[in-house]
Amino acid sequence: MKTSVFIAIFNLLVCALAYTDLTGSIKINDKKITLGEFNTQEVKQLTINSPKDIIEIDLKSKDIKGKPEQIMVSLADVKNPAISTHYVPVVKESKIKLNIKALSIPEVLKTKDKLVLTIVIADSKSKNNMIRRLVEVLPSPEFKSTSRYQAKPRIGIQPEIHHIFREDERTVNPIVPVVFIIAAFTLLLGLFGSWVGFIGIDNLFRTFKTISKVQLLHNVSFLISVLGFELNFVKYYLGQSIFTTLFYGFILSIPCVYFGVSVLRSLAKNRALGK
């Protein structure tokens, strides 16, 4: 597609020679420039401020006697002429007219800093052919902001990808430690209740006189171990790490099992003796 456009433009360039008597005006809103018969190097400028603007081209050439074989108006980027769009004006006798709505300009051209409007006239039966830069069109920042153009990514170095991995949860749902705390307190109360049920409230404190000091130490150590478990779960509920909680739980389980077995054996022995 691009190749065919370049070939057509090249053919027009080969044919284009003169048409120096081109006169008329180009207007955008209330701003207007005029073209004289002399083709000077100076190219005037007009500004597009809104998508509602219209580029009005009204030209006249004495050498044109009807529509030429080839006539085209192009709007292209000054820095990169390959980015362009083309229009066919209306030719009636020696008059050339064309209205270009700013809204119809390609999105990519709306983003450019400076555009150039050029007319090409060529006819194989005439020696007076022409290529002429008519005016430079400057898209305003407000007009640029209306463009929906997005540049396509090119092959090459791409921006570095940054990804923040989500950290593991430091604690579980608060309801879990609450359930463990309630269960631990329930078991502790059940332990005391079983002692009262088996031994009786009157004989509970009397057993301190019948058991040895070593067994009393084991009983107290067992109670301290159970309270340690309670404290460990409370600290976990207040924000202690799960790994720290498991570590302390493992440490407390050793004396708890050891002294718990001793307490149960002592209770079984005393019950067998009827104490």
Curated annotation (Swiss-Prot):
Q: What does the record say about its membrane topology?
A: Multi-pass membrane protein
A family per Pfam: Ribophorin_II_C
Q: Which InterPro entries match?
A: Ribophorin_II_C (IPR056790), Swp1 (IPR008814)
Signal peptide per UniProt: 1-18
Query: From which residue to which does any coiled coil extend?
Result: none
Where are the bilayer-spanning segments? 179-199, 214-234, 241-261
From what superkingdom does this record's organism come? Eukaryota
Q: What UniProt keywords are attached to this protein's entry?
A: Endoplasmic reticulum, Membrane, Signal, Transmembrane, Transmembrane helix, Virulence
Briefly, what is this protein's role? Answer: Subunit of the oligosaccharyl transferase (OST) complex that catalyzes the initial transfer of a defined glycan (Glc(3)Man(9)GlcNAc(2) in eukaryotes) from the lipid carrier dolichol-pyrophosphate to an asparagine residue within an Asn-X-Ser/Thr consensus motif in nascent polypeptide chains, the first step in protein N-glycosylation. N-glycosylation occurs cotranslationally and the complex associates with the Sec61 complex at the channel-forming translocon complex that mediates protein translocation across the endoplasmic reticulum (ER). All subunits are required for a maximal enzyme activity.
Q: To which protein family does this belong? A: Belongs to the SWP1 family.
- Please describe the quaternary structure of this protein: Component of the oligosaccharyltransferase (OST) complex.
Give the protein's recorded name.
Dolichyl-diphosphooligosaccharide--protein glycosyltransferase subunit delta
Native species of this protein?
Candida albicans (strain SC5314 / ATCC MYA-2876)
